[in-house]
UniProtKB/Swiss-Prot annotation:
The modification N6-(pyridoxal phosphate)lysine is found at K197. L-glutamate binds at S9, R42. Pyridoxal 5'-phosphate binds at A76, R77, W102, T153, D173, Q196, N238, T239. Homodimer. Its main location: cytoplasm. This is Phosphoserine aminotransferase.
Length: 361
């Protein structure tokens, strides 16, 4: 079978080395004669998996010791509710930065629990979609926290600035960027990410929370979303998604073998440069996001003649380039190039794009 490159926005491509190891171990994990999916989450064997995964994740992100790491259910949408219910305390207000679809979704959920101060950061620059700089955001003095999403997967818009808001508690949805570039965890109060883009399969959510933010949950908060309950029970208040946890642990080890987040950051930049360079050098393709706010993970692009979209998708799929159809809100194409996507995959895509333009432009 020829090489297939999966450009899905999530669930996304996983490292082939990880998939092969999981395949080898699937029915007889560590010589136990059973699958890792079948053993108790409280067995010493799985506890070792869980502890190794947390240690590797901490090493990769350089997480300070005064932060808890939680392995949760519920995805980012679950965290849209968990964040306000855990952090608001007696506050009635939180700052929410609206940079696109997912930020707006977090705002909609937060409105059930508080009155968000919404900062609309969407703007245009020379006719291109952009995000206003952080120093222009009008934050509240009395907000419990400020929430933003650094990367909008649908719009292909990213906020590359590092937050510097003094002593404000900063919360970030890193679902599509986690482990793709180094970050200073100490700048944040809470980080959360669905696993299905840069970590592992769907079903697992990672939360990193500063310890001083624990213990302030609203009384109506379900225990399964309570950061304090999860921390006190080592993320095993109920049965966790064990197979997703195991596979994510394999991905963490793969990332360390590749050289860590710093090395992946270089690779991700090279992939993005190649793809955007191909788009920008052509009149046949276009990207409508200002250069300073272009996403390195999700690259939307349109053809000059939308009537060719269907043919582009058919021919690219036949060439082993899968899941390139853009989101219905934006249209066109979208290439998601997370950590597991090799440079060779992006090169295959750009070669196809150049050839398609030659034949149909």
């Amino acid at each position: 079978m020829s090489q297939i490159f999966n450009f899905s926005s999530g669930p996304a491509m996983l490292p082939v080395e990880v998939l092969r190891r999981a395949e080898q171990e699937l029915c007889n994990w560590r010589g136990l004669g059973t699958s890792v999916m079948e053993i108790s989450h409280r067995s010493k064997e799985f506890i070792q998996v869980a502890e190794e995964a947390e240690k590797d994740f901490r090493d990769l992100l350089k997480i300070p010791s005064n932060y808890k790491v939680l392995f949760c259910h519920g995805g980012a949408r679950g965290q849209f509710a968990a964040v306000p219910l855990n952090l608001l305390g007696q506050h009635g207000k939180a700052d929410y930065v609206d940079g696109g679809y997912w930020a707006a979704s977090a705002i909609k959920e937060a409105q059930k629990y508080c009155t968000p101060n919404v900062i609309d950061a969407k703007t245009t620059l020379n006719g291109l979609r952009a995000i206003s700089p952080m120093n222009s955001w009008e934050l509240s003095d009395d907000a419990a926290y400020v929430h933003f999403c650094p990367n909008e997967t649908i719009d292909g818009i990213a906020i590359h600035e590092t937050p510097d808001f003094g002593d404000k508690t900063v919360v970030a949805d890193l679902s599509s960027t986690i482990l793709s570039t180094p970050i200073d965890v100490s700048r944040y109060g809470v980080l959360y990410a669905g696993a299905q883009k840069n970590i592992g399969p769907a079903g697992l959510t990672l939360v990193v929370v500063r310890e001083d933010l624990l213990g302030h949950a609203r009384k109506e908060l379900p225990s399964i979303l309570d950061y304090t309950v999860l921390a006190e029970n080592d993320s095993m208040f109920n049965t966790p998604p064990t197979f997703a946890w195991y596979l994510s642990g394999l991905v963490f080890k793969w990332l360390k073998e590749q050289g860590g987040v710093g090395e992946l950051d270089k690779r991700n930049q090279a992939k993005a440069d190649l793809l955007y360079g191909t788009i920008d050098s052509s009149d046949f393709y276009r990207n409508d996001v200002a250069v300073a706010n272009r996403s390195r993970m999700n690259v939307p692009f349109q053809l000059a003649d939308a009537a060719l979209d269907k043919l582009f998708l058919e021919e690219s799929f036949a060439a082993g380039l899968h899941a390139l159809k853009g989101h219905r809100v934006v249209g066109g194409m979208r290439a998601s190039i997370y950590n597991a996507m090799p440079l060779a995959g992006v090169k295959t895509l750009t070669d196809f794009m150049i050839d398609f333009e030659r034949r149909h432009g």
